[in-house]
Amino acid sequence: MEKIVLLLAIVSLVKSDQICIGYHANNSTEQVDTIMEKNVTVTHAQDILEKTHNGKLCDLDGVKPLILRDCSVAGWLLGNPMCDEFINVPEWSYIVEKASPANDLCYPGDFNDYEELKHLLSRINHFEKIQIIPKSSWSNHEASSGVSSACPYQGKSSFFRNVVWLIKKNSAYPTIKRSYNNTNQEDLLILWGIHHPNDAAEQTKLYQNPTTYISVGTSTLNQRLVPKIATRSKVNGQSGRMEFFWTILKPNDAINFESNGNFIAPEYAYKIVKKGDSAIMKSELEYGNCNTKCQTPMGAINSSMPFHNIHPLTIGECPKYVKSNRLVLATGLRNTPQRERRRKKRGLFGAIAGFIEGGWQGMVDGWYGYHHSNEQGSGYAADKESTQKAIDGVTNKVNSIIDKMNTQFEAVGREFNNLERRIENLNKKMEDGFLDVWTYNAELLVLMENERTLDFHDSNVKNLYDKVRLQLRDNAKELGNGCFEFYHKCDNECMESVKNGTYDYPQYSEEARLNREEISGVKLESMGTYQILSIYSTVASSLALAIMVAGLSLWMCSNGSLQCRICI
């Protein structure tokens, strides 16, 4: 009878109603790194490092770049005859110059403060070329004879289009005194130059006067130049050299020129009609007839990610450049399907729901939820409230990280002349240092936020478990694996009340108490039965052993194998 009661009790325990708390799992193979672990598989993740580009030069916010092709900035501004396609250019978003353009200063020489001029151009989006001193106004000097085979055009000698090389006329070079007053509302970029002959004979041949000078003055500029006559090696067939200068003439200011030889006079100037963010980008790419918000020398980036690893030099609304190869943010949970046992490991920032052995692939409509089983069946149900709060929290966190890191950031190359190489090297070291710091900060941020996110999910599962536990109290038994076993019948309506937090503890407490006491009594009674059976079994086996030993002894004595002596 006792065995029958025990068997019925066991059967009733197996068929008890249950509710379990768990979390979502899927077939994702996405992996993230945290402070504590590497390559943690998660249900959802978001890459925040852009690694792709289109390999083209594109319009920036609908404005085309000025692609100088085989011309340099100097060749464009002075008017190298091979750069005639850039005589008048529309508004540009940025300027593209090749690393070693073929059409630079056709007549050999130097461009003074060239790097500073390029820096100025990085804040200009449009020039308007205007004539300030007409070529025809030089009646006392030869304005058309100043050409060179170093600057050919259609097989003939020519010269820079925007300046005039003045030569003596009728064996005389009268002293020049010219002024130009800037009556425009915009600043003017004005260029001029000086010719340095190869020897004294060339000096008098071109300018008649053996000793010459050039004076240039504005409200902020006071310059006096003299030619440097010296024997030099030929470049582009020329032993002479030319040196070019520039200045910005403010509105209502005047520029004054005085010279008695070697003067390369301005004919055209550039009115700065639009200022803005621009850049001079070194690139060999071709125009791709495309549009972008971020351009690099390697190609355009169209991405909302906060970081990229394509090229450190950029123009536009660009992510920050880092040296990392991988930056992935966890947005979902640890992906540990139920077939795999979960390691009970505590995170860095909070408690982990390590009592749950694995996630549920059957629960697809939420991150956290329930699995129940009763006489009416079984099924999964997501906890929509906790899931939505978690989604909002993680989404806000990811957006916050992206917003904080996605500030408008431009990094354009700086150019230095030969005398500034030490400054250039120091600048490169500083920029490399900044990139190292940015990279370290980005990687550390991702590691810490991933740790927080995973612990945040674990904490939410534990909170859901505690919510159920506090409702059920002693009306159910904790099984230690995230499940509760009811001491009373719990139909679907009852299960739903547990899930939505309206479980009526008093309604089921009496039934639960009786079932709990009955199960406890069965356990005690069955324990007493087992004790009696064990004592009986011990005594019986001992008695049987004694009889066997006595019988064996008598048999051995009877056949002489064993001698028995009784001493009194």
Swiss-Prot record:
It comes from Influenza A virus (strain A/Duck/Hong Kong/2986.1/2000 H5N1 genotype C). The keyword Ubl conjugation does not apply. Binds to sialic acid-containing receptors on the cell surface, bringing about the attachment of the virus particle to the cell. This attachment induces virion internalization of about two third of the virus particles through clathrin-dependent endocytosis and about one third through a clathrin- and caveolin-independent pathway. Plays a major role in the determination of host range restriction and virulence. Class I viral fusion protein. Homotrimer of disulfide-linked HA1-HA2. The gene is HA. Gene3D superfamilies: 3.90.20.10, 3.90.209.20, Hemagglutinin Chain A, Domain 2. Disulfide bonds join 20-483, 58-290, 71-83, 106-151, 294-318, 490-494. Coiled coil: none annotated. One of its GO terms (molecular function) is host cell surface receptor binding. The record marks 346-347 as: Cleavage. This is Hemagglutinin. Residues 553-568 are cytoplasmic. GO terms for cellular component: host cell plasma membrane; membrane; viral envelope; virion membrane. It is a single-pass type I membrane protein. Belongs to the influenza viruses hemagglutinin family. The keyword Membrane applies. It is found in: Virion membrane; Host apical cell membrane.
